[in-house]
């Protein structure tokens, strides 16, 4: 009985203390969110010149190679980004590249949605519609740079090489048409192994396609001539992740091409 009375008395004191504002211990909710490890990357300013646009892509690719992407990792500002892009776009660069699933230009240049205008064709060989798309981005969206980017281990280049002028089946003739002359202008050296020759063909194709869009577009020639636009061939290495940029195509080069 004495023990029961003592227990009841202790319980009564605890209730009285709680009524008079004694703080009660409580556990933090199990679902409480942990503090963010870092804030979302601020929106990047758009480059205001062709050289600045190329520098931005080069810096983004360096982050990708180093495993330090900043603009394609954070998701905290996705909603705001979608809201802003719903009102329009202003991509600072056009990337014409291959349809290969391993070539993800936004990731390898570490750029958010709305910053790159992407045109994809097998063999990075744009047809007239692809060139028109590039003109649209330059004329109406303000793009200041076109990167014509090939890549290593390109299946389209391999197919052209193995066909060696013989017709490919189905509609693949269009692929041969878009890359016509590649083997003739880039013959294999007698002592050159297959791997080295493929690497040379992939680079040559990127350069030829960059020249091709300049040849076929008066609008792009005018912009390049007035230094408002650069057209830059490039090659993406699938293994290293690095993009090698080559010298911009110029009107002088275009005239020499003829």
Predicted features and spans:
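Gly/Ser/Thr-rich loops at beta-strand to alpha-helix junctions
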Residues: 100-102, 151-156
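Short acidic/polar active-site loop segments enriched in Thr and Asp
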Residues: 144
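Active-site cofactor/substrate anionic-group-binding motifs, chiefly glycine-
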Residues: 92, 96-133
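Divalent-metal-activated hydrolytic enzyme cores
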Residues: 19-88, 114, 123-132, 136-141, ...
């Amino acid at each position: 009985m004495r023990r029961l009375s003592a227990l009841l008395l202790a319980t009564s004191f605890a209730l009285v203390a709680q009524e008079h504002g004694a703080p009660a211990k409580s556990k933090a909710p199990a679902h409480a969110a942990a503090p963010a490890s870092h804030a979302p990357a601020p929106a990047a300013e758009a480059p205001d010149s062709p050289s600045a646009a190329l520098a931005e892509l080069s810096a983004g690719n360096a982050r990708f190679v180093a495993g330090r992407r900043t603009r394609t990792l954070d998701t905290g500002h996705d909603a705001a980004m979608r809201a802003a892009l719903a009102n329009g776009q202003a991509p600072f660069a056009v990337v014409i590249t291959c349809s290969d699933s391993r070539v993800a230009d936004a990731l390898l240049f570490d750029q958010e949605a709305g910053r790159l205008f992407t045109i994809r064709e097998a063999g990075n060989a744009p047809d007239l519609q692809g060139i028109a798309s590039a003109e649209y981005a330059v004329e109406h969206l303000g793009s200041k740079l076109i990167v014509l980017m090939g890549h290593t281990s390109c299946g389209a280049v391999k197919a052209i090489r193995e066909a060696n002028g013989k017709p490919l089946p189905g509609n693949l003739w269009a692929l041969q048409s878009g890359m016509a002359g590649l083997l003739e202008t880039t013959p294999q050296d007698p002592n050159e192994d297959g791997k080295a020759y493929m690497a040379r063909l992939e680079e040559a194709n990127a350069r030829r396609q960059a020249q091709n869009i300049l040849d076929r577009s008066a609008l792009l020639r005018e912009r390049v001539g007035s230094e408002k636009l650069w057209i830059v061939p490039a090659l993406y290495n699938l293994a290293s992740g690095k993009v090698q940029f080559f010298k911009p195509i110029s009107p002088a080069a275009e005239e020499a091409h003829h």
